[in-house]
Amino acid sequence: MQQITQDYLANKAKELLNSGICSRVFGWKRGEFDYDLTPAVFTTAEQIDREFVYNGFCAANFSKYLVNETRRDAGKVAVFLKPCDSYSFNQLLTEHRFDREKVYAVGIPCEGMTDINKVRQAVDGIAKLTFDENGNIIVETLYDGTATLDRNECMLERCIHCKSKRCVVYDELLGENGEVLDDSRFDEVKKLEAMTADERFAFWQGELSRCIRCNACRD
């Protein structure tokens, strides 16, 4: 599967703006920390060059943001959709939550996103985070120099149990589309069934506290 880099996506975003296909692009920009990436709307190539970021911490799902963004009378908005994002996009579209004609959807492949909590468990005193060409995490620490963490050991749980690498809706697809996976995600159900009532309550309390009602789980 083709690996999508930050430069590749940034150039695509500028191409969409310069060609007039869209008037703005949903992307990611850095927050206070290297792992604190947040959705942002880009309207110029200069803004993209200055602020656009794409790496293993870009787990944010843009689909829900389209509900409000497409209500603006400001032309078409382009959005990058990972396979899991495309499921929530499809569900929200089915529920008529946004105007499809106002969106240019670009499907992108994804090999899984990084869980900052797993990185924190592996190293202390994080000063700077970057990724190598294979997606492994390079951590500069305050106390113990630099550490390299295997991306597969620090992946988000939902990515470990990913149900599909296939984008189900798009106007343009970058790279090759993936496949629906025959994974072992129901192993997690067995773990839940083995929990006590209090443990299950605590588990779902933690899961639902992060819910943004993107509706990907309903598709």
Regions found by a protein language model. Give the residues of each.
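Helix-loop elements that line ligand-binding/catalytic pockets
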Residues: 212
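Iron-sulfur-associated redox domains of electron-transfer enzymes in respiratory
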Residues: 1-208, 218
